[in-house]
Amino acid sequence: PDVEAADVKLHWEPYQPNKFEVAQTSQAIVMYSGESKLNGKIAIGEAGMTGAGTLEFASAEVASKKFRFRKEDFKSDTASFAFTARDEVKNDGTKEVAIKTDNVKADVSFKNRQGQFKSNSADSYIEFPVNKYIAYMDELRWYMDKDEVDMNSSMNEIDLIGSRFVSTRPDQDSITF
């Protein structure tokens, strides 16, 4: 992808493959025509461009210790995803997280304008911090331009109970539906 970076730390070992690294210092690394900012680092080598850190979008964040970047997409075998409402800002200036999940395989396409996140573990869940619920589902699809998220559970085929939503509020005593 196209990358713009200022005030960065460079590390280059010309006789070693995969040893050209750019690490952000005070400003995020701007990527994908300004649609995302990486707080972290990138490395360029024979295998292409890789990176680590948190990619910020207008309404989402994807964090990983290892991204694989390509011209119109990026992937990660293990990532975290957080969906925020563009206009929902807390008193401290940070965005309110509506949906978040960890330990997912990420596949985000700027060409198709969507991201797909699949759970790496059968006991993973999706968290709704504002509503104080968690849901046992293993797939989430993010539509970038619509600010929408679809969730699915392929566990339904095995588990006849289906998707479960569980309250995390102490006064609701783990109410489930």
Can you say where each PLM-predicted feature lies in the sequence?
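Structural signature for solvent-exposed beta-strand/loop edge elements and short helix-capping sites
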Residues: 1-177
